[in-house]
UniProtKB/Swiss-Prot annotation:
Chain intervals with Low complexity compositional bias: 192-243, 293-305
Residues annotated for GTP binding in this entry: 424-431, 470-474, 524-527
Annotated source species: Xanthomonas campestris pv. campestris (strain ATCC 33913 / DSM 3586 / NCPPB 528 / LMG 568 / P 25)
G1: annotated span: 424-431
Annotated spans, G2: 449-453
HAMAP family in the record: IF_2_B
Full protein name: Translation initiation factor IF-2
Annotated ranges, domain tr-type G: 415-584
Length: 916
């Protein structure tokens, strides 16, 4: 019931003080039985529909219905109900590593939690009477004691937790120390056992140690032997006896690989010194390091023999752990790859030759030279194919600096006006509705009466400032509508009451849901005779847009843009929705926002229509907008005035950029022009590299496609110039979408502004058609167009562009040859003729058989011959054609195998023009 929910209060005004139940049911458009049931549920019993309902009883019924639908009786109660609830939204970002083939990929996971706290009714209803000062003091002391006790309990719990943790750590350390001691004891036992097993028996008793160390004699085969080492010099020292020279020679001669360096039972002093004190070595390692590798060469007693016997040079031939070892597994490198990389740079990072990388690319089906750039995905695939690991390089240094500037601009947030986008099907009255709100005539100024740009306006109403974005409704402007939905706060969907839901209406609903913005439906043209608002509500149910009348949450407002009916109600609904959203923004500091539309003005240069989302945009600010930059020379609002600054949710036109930015680019204000220029140049470089990679890939795909087809596709080249960037984007998407397997629409160049000499030269070189959308060619361009015979066409409505390009493309397709059967003859008997051979006596069972048309002979529904007629006779006369139900004689040229029961099929070939 609409009046019960406060949407049409005029019903209550029209009701008299005493009304019967029947009359009340007629006023609120509710069955009498249902109204009686609702009155009974509200606690009022009536015997019949003719009883009188007083104002008190009506208010009681109204309060009951409000409570039933979850509404408060008064605004004060509604405010109190809202104050009892608080909703907390929490977002948590996590990174999860998942396996993706040979590598692991990190995926960002966002966890959203929503929790609503409701204040209990008992807290307000069960509140005790005011306490006396003594009672308040006792209550405070009790709470203080309870708080102290809780703090003591918490401290005790934390102390016990710390004590348990320390005990666990100490226990773990003791276990580790015990394990180390056990391993050390086992190692010492193994060393002692190995030393006892390898120690030889003493040859003779050692002489008494002298107080001074004996001088070492020179080591030579003819010299005297060295005296034995004192007993306390080394724990491994053993008594030794002088050895004869021939014994040394024999020891050097019979020494083998891995044997002890021993001369007549005396251990080599150099080996003992070299490894003395290395207690960390096991017995086996000590023995291995003490061995002398290699075989002796030369005569016994020579210098080479002495080196091999364990002299000073013996350490060079030992194979210690620091010697070179050939790697047993390939080296896996971690290669950082940006958005694009040349094949030569990738080969250098992989430590491979450039030819090897080119071969790997060829095996993967990518034909590239060593100087060509490849994209990140291709480089990562070839890196994985060569056995290395690819990681994405972070080369956004200037982007990080830009983000840091944007974060510095954050300050105190204040309320901002809502940004409302008007969306809907073409000719449903979007611009007319906005025109009535603004009290201007914008719709009549658009070509064809349809909107082809995004119009941005802000309107000051009695309920505050509201910024409106008027989007086109034509199917070609899909990207414009999607861009408008992304930067908006509220979407007003305009639906004509006589037309209902149309394709672009459904698309607008999808854009609004994808952007996650609330929707308000304005049912327009209710003043027309065939208006049916209920039909609109039912059709939008299929798109999951449920009206409040049907139990949903979407507001439906019936308006008329022509006479202004319901416009104030629509503005109220927008203001109410904006209050619910609680829109906030930083009003001061560096500005940032989005480009809505851009164009090239002949007198003012590049002009960008931007929507400020944060901060304040002022004249003189340095701006970075996509790949363009510059200093703000002037600001203009929709009325042509120059405001001093533009705050959040205010659309303005900006002059002073270096070029025309693309619609949808984000802009941000920076400190100086140098940073702005560096960021813009880096973005331009990245975009150019990506474009080169994409063009190389497209060229290769075109070559492969031409190889796979015999004749290849017909190509229609176009040069598109328009007045604004949004129109260029819409034209490109709409015209390229006309391509199919037989013809391809190729846009070789597009841009904003008039048609220049370079545009004409490009069209002449590629034999392209020039399309000017709301722009004209200058004198030099017209001269080139006339001299080269270039097809130049001007348009102002996008419908005409699409239709004429379809006609031109259809002309390139040529004609298609089709065969159409015109008659069938049944062979009843076969006669022999001396002149024609076999002559078929036939009955025409369908259509007409003509002498000049080709025929086919079918036997058991299978074609056995295709040729032409040699003779067609009716009785004995030659005739040109024989119609259905007539007997005739047919002579088939160069075919004498006609049999009874065959069918002769007569057909003709016709040419049909091909269309897209």
């Amino acid at each position: 019931m609409l009046w019960a929910r406060g949407r049409q209060p005029d019903h209550r005004i029209r009701m008299s003080q005493q009304t019967t139940i029947r009359k009340l049911a007629e006023l609120v458009n509710t069955p009498v039985d249902k109204l009686l049931v609702q009155l009974a549920e509200a606690g009022m019993k009536f015997s019949g529909p003719d009883q009188v309902v007083t104002s008190t009883e009506k208010m009681k019924l109204l309060g009951f219905l409000r409570r039933t639908h979850g509404k408060a009786d008064t605004p004060a109660e509604a405010a109190s109900e809202a104050a009892k609830k608080i909703t907390l939204n929490r977002r948590k970002l996590q990174e999860v590593t998942v396996n993706a083939g040979r590598t692991k990929t990190t995926v960002n996971v966002e966890v959203r939690q929503k929790r609503t706290y409701v204040k209990s009714e008992n807290e307000g209803s069960g509140r005790a009477a005011p306490m006396t000062p003594d009672e308040e003091r006792a209550d405070i002391l009790a709470k203080l004691a309870a708080s102290r006790q809780r703090n003591l309990d918490e401290q005790q719990r934390l102390a016990e937790s710390d004590r348990a943790r320390d005990e666990a750590i100490q226990r773990k350390r003791d276990e580790e120390q015990a394990a180390k001691d056990r391993v050390e004891a086992e190692r010492k036992a193994a060393e002692e056992a190995a030393a006892a097993a390898s120690a030889p028996a003493p040859v003779a008793a050692a002489p008494a140690p002298s107080s001074a160390p004996a001088a070492r004699a020179p080591s030579s085969p003819s010299s005297a032997p060295r005296p034995a080492r004192p007993a306390g010099a080394s724990p491994a020292s053993r008594p030794a006896t002088p050895a004869r020279p021939d014994d040394r020679n024999n020891a050097a001669k019979h020494k083998t690989r891995g044997s002890h360096v021993m001369v007549a039972g005396v251990e080599d002093d150099d080996a003992t010194k070299r490894f003395a004190g290395q207690l960390h070595l096991s017995a086996a390692d000590r023995a291995r390091r003490s061995n002398v590798r290699g075989k002796p060469t030369g005569r016994p007693g020579s210098s080479s023999s002495r080196r091999n016997d364990g002299g000073r040079g013996s350490n060079q031939s030992n194979s210690g752990p620091h010697g070179f070892e050939r790697p047993t597994a390939p080296v896996v490198r971690e290669v950082a790859i940006g958005e694009t990389i040349t094949v030569a740079d990738l080969a250098q990072k992989l430590a491979l030759k450039g030819g090897d990388v080119v071969k790997a690319l060829f095996k993967m089906g990518v034909m590239a030279t060593i100087t060509q750039s490849i994209d990140h995905d291709t480089a990562a695939l070839v890196t994985e194919e060569l056995g290395h690991k690819a990681v994405r390089a972070d080369n956004a240094d200037f982007e990080d600096a830009l983000l840091a500037h944007a974060e510095d601009a954050q300050g105190e947030t204040t309320s901002r006006p809502p940004v409302v986008t008007i969306m809907g099907h073409v000719d449903h009255g979007k611009t007319s509705l906005l025109d009535y709100i603004r009290r201007t005539k914008i719709a009549s100024g658009e070509a064809g009466g349809i909107t082809q740009h995004i119009g941005a306006y802000h309107v000051e109403t009695g309920r505050g400032v509201i910024s409106f974005l008027d989007t086109p409704g034509h199917a070609a402007f899909t990207s414009m509508r999607a861009r408008g939905a992304k930067i908006t706060d509220i979407v007003v969907l305009v639906v004509a009451a006589d037309d209902g839901v149309m394709p672009q209406t459904k698309e607008a609903v999808a854009h609004a849901k994808a952007a996650g913005v609330p929707l308000i439906v304005a049912v327009n043209k209710i003043d027309k005779a065939g208006a049916d608002p209920l039909r609109v509500k039912n059709e939008l149910l299929a798109e999951n847009v449920v009206a409040e009348d049907f139990g949903g949450d979407t507001q439906f407002i019936e308006v008329s843009a022509k006479v202004g009916t319901g416009v104030d109600t629509l503005l109220d609904a927008i203001s109410l929705q904006a209050e619910v959203l609680e829109l906030k923004a930083v009003a001061d500091g560096r500005a940032s926002g989005t480009v809505i539309e851009s164009s090239l003005d002949k007198g003012r240069g590049p002009v960008a229509t931007v929507l400020v989302q944060q901060g304040a945009l002022k004249r003189g600010d340095y701006l970075v907008c996509g790949i363009q930059y510059g200093r703000v020379r002037a600001l203009f609002d929709e009325t042509g005035h120059q405001p001093a600054s533009a705050g959040p949710s205010i659309p303005v036109q900006v002059l002073g950029l270096s070029g025309v930015p693309e619609a949808g680019d984000d802009f941000v204000v920076v400190d100086d022009e140098r940073l702005a220029k560096d960021v813009a140049q880096q973005r331009e470089t990245k975009r150019r590299e990506s474009r080169l990679v994409a063009s190389a890939t497209n060229r290769m795909e075109d070559i492969l496609a031409q190889m796979g087809k015999g004749e290849g596709q017909q190509v229609l080249n176009l040069v598109i110039k328009a007045d604004v960037q949004g129109s260029v984007e819409a034209l490109k998407q709409s015209l390229v979408a006309l391509s199919n397997d037989d013809i391809r629409i190729n846009v070789i160049h597009s841009g904003v502004g008039g048609i220049t000499e370079s545009d004409a030269n490009s069209a002449a070189a590629s034999k392209a058609t020039i399309i000017g959308f709301n722009v004209r060619a200058d004198a030099s361009a017209r001269k080139i167009v006339e001299s080269n015979g270039i097809d130049l066409r001007y348009f102002s409505i996008i419908y005409d562009v699409i239709d004429q390009v379809k006609q031109v493309a259809s002309g390139l397709l040529g004609v298609e040859i089709r065969e159409e059967i015109i008659g069938i003859a049944q062979v009843r008997d076969v006669f022999r003729s001396s002149k024609f051979g076999a002559v078929a006596g036939c009955m025409i069972i369908e259509g007409v058989v003509k002498r000049s048309k080709p025929i086919r002979v079918l036997r058991d529904s299978v074609v056995v011959f295709e040729g032409e007629l040699e003779s067609l006779r009716r009785f004995k006369e030659n005739v040109d054609e024989v119609r259905n139900g007539t007997e005739c004689g047919i002579g088939v040229k160069a075919y004498n195998d006609v049999k009874a029961g065959d069918q002769i099929e007569c057909f003709e070939r016709i040419e049909v023009a091909r269309t897209l």
